[in-house]
Regions:
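Alpha-helix-loop-beta-strand connector modules within alpha/beta enzyme cores
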Residues: 37-51
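Structural preference for beta-strand elements that scaffold enzyme active sites
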Residues: 13, 51-55, 81-82, 125
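Non-cysteine beta-strand/loop elements that form the S-adenosyl-L-methionine
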Residues: 13-21, 43, 82-86
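Active-site mouth loops of central-metabolism enzymes
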Residues: 29-30, 57-66
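Glycine-rich tight-turn/loop motif centered on a GG-T
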Residues: 25-36, 98, 102
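Single conserved hydrophobic/aromatic residue that forms the stacking wall/gate
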Residues: 1-12
Length: 163
């Protein structure tokens, strides 16, 4: 069990350098990042299959904060757990993409409360606002709440703190 626990604590990242990878592929870095999609998806799928975190590669164009923001939003949408950084000025931007919004936190709280109520009544599946709420939806809601907690977005009672 300790090996399994240790594996879960490890993280996998786009350890092949994006610069090395694009050179090996006989291409180079483009603003839209399309040249990295295959490698990103392979890393992400391998991490998910192993049950460990996945972090994207470094964004090397320090003169393009808008490009960094777009890329960070993209990798968040793909499902990466975070982004590798070499510049501390990028931390706030990554956090702004990954921190749940007030609406996401409120929705997650409602999902968790509703499924708990359903569990008490002996039901495993419910509907909220016309959407089915089952285990995957609950797991996503729990992840939102975990992210909110580690981002210090909740007070002691679990209420969202406005920044």
């Amino acid at each position: 069990h300790s090996l399994r626990r240790r594996q879960r604590q490890m993280c996998i990242r786009d350890s092949l350098s994006a610069e090395d990878y694009t050179t090996d592929m006989k291409t180079h870095r483009y603003p839209d990042g399309a040249e990295l999609e295959f490698a990103r998806n392979m890393v992400l799928h391998a991490a998910r299959a192993a049950g460990i975190a996945a972090f994207d590669t470094v964004f090397t164009n320090m003169a393009d904060p808008d490009g960094f923001y777009r890329e960070t939003r993209h990798i968040h949408q793909l499902g990466f757990d975070g982004k590798s950084l070499v510049n501390p000025r990028q931390i706030a931007m990554v956090n702004s993409v990954y921190e749940p919004t007030k609406d996401e936190v409120i929705k997650a709280q409602k999902v968790i409360a509703a499924i708990e109520e359903a569990r008490i009544k002996g039901s495993g599946v419910i509907s909220m606002n016309g959407q089915m709420v089952d285990r995957p939806v609950v797991l996503r809601a729990q992840r939102v709440m975990s992210l909110a907690k580690v981002s210090n977005l909740l007070d002691e009672e679990g209420n969202y703190i406005e920044k």
